[in-house]
């Protein structure tokens, strides 16, 4: 049986359907091929974009983490993941919780000024050359500032003080003269030596002159223009005040000034001083004269020898035996102690060091002071002065008794009053020394006095 053919009205739709299917299949194949070609020809570009996208995301996450800063306190606090810990913080791992914890260190208690903030240190901001330039400018600025301050200070000094030349010029215009010490002393000597000056003016001139001659150079200048002899001659005045203040000036000029001492001996000062001490004069005048005598004799063996020749020990003996002269007696005893020890030390120094000149050593050896003291009865005089009530006076007398012990030992032993006085002082100073020990003074004043008394008693047994 022959096959049946389809009518033409059905064939047309089938052909259209088949054509659409073929067109769709072709389009799909073409698009798939283009996609593969695109993927194969641009792999690097696609990978770079993906990497940049991931890095950007990581940086954003990192910035977010950095901005979350941990603020430590003095108590332990748990650290969250990603938190920034300020430098200097103390970090530990809590073994119980497994968390990291942080707090401030103890030494940061008073110097945590950053409050946990990060310092933005950008090393690319300044180069080393920039820093050097900035430092140079800073130094220049400091120097300029210092220079400005110096100029301002100098201007202030110039405003307050004027040059000496300008002052002299102004003084010349005002008839005012700036005097040197030498000129002042010449004027004072002329005032004192003028017959037209009153007693008050003469005393005022001597009083002012004493201030200047304390300086060694001024005292020698006084000698150079003849002023020293004028003052020495003032010791002959009939006015006790003139004698007193003239001796006051001489005592200041003689003190530790060998050149002036020599000229004073040659000018007759020693004889005049002894005459005043040997005659009836006010106590104040004799104090000043005795001061001048002590200044003249100390460290001047030639003057000491002349003092002995002129009967100085007799004059002093008479002085201390007068009533109401206890103050002078203590000063005389102190002078004798100084002269005796001075000679002893000078001879010892000459033997040990051999630095003293033979001439001066010979002068000291010619001063026979200890034999003179023994002959003039100073052993007994000094011992009787131990009865003075003042502790300071007793101290000086005890010192003098000690240096005279070798010369006066026999006379001390034969003096019953001295033994009783020493025993009384021993009992008195034992009580006072024990009080010092109770107050915690191991080397007190009264303990030293007690030691001197005990030493004398031991030597005289």
Curated annotation (Swiss-Prot):
InterPro entries: ARM-like, ARM-type_fold, Hsp70_NEF-Inhibitors, Nucleotide_exch_fac_Fes1. Glycans are attached at residues 193, 236. Pfam families: Fes1 (PF08609). N-glycosylated. Ubiquitinated by the CRL2(FEM1A) and CRL2(FEM1C) complexes, which recognize the -Lys-Xaa-Xaa-Arg C-degron at the C-terminus, leading to its degradation. Highly expressed in tissues which produce large amounts of secreted proteins such as kidney, liver and placenta. Also expressed in colon, heart, lung, ovary, pancreas, peripheral leukocyte, prostate, spleen and thymus. Expressed at low levels throughout the brain. The keyword Transcription does not apply. Residues 1-256 are annotated as: Interaction with HSPA5 and localization to the endoplasmic reticulum. It is found in: Endoplasmic reticulum lumen. One of its GO terms (molecular function) is adenyl-nucleotide exchange factor activity. GO terms for cellular component: endoplasmic reticulum; endoplasmic reticulum lumen; extracellular space. The keyword Transport applies. Keywords: Disease variant, Endoplasmic reticulum, Glycoprotein, Protein transport, Signal, Translocation, Transport, Ubl conjugation. Required for protein translocation and folding in the endoplasmic reticulum (ER). Functions as a nucleotide exchange factor for the ER lumenal chaperone HSPA5. Interacts with HSPA5. This is Nucleotide exchange factor SIL1. It comes from Homo sapiens.
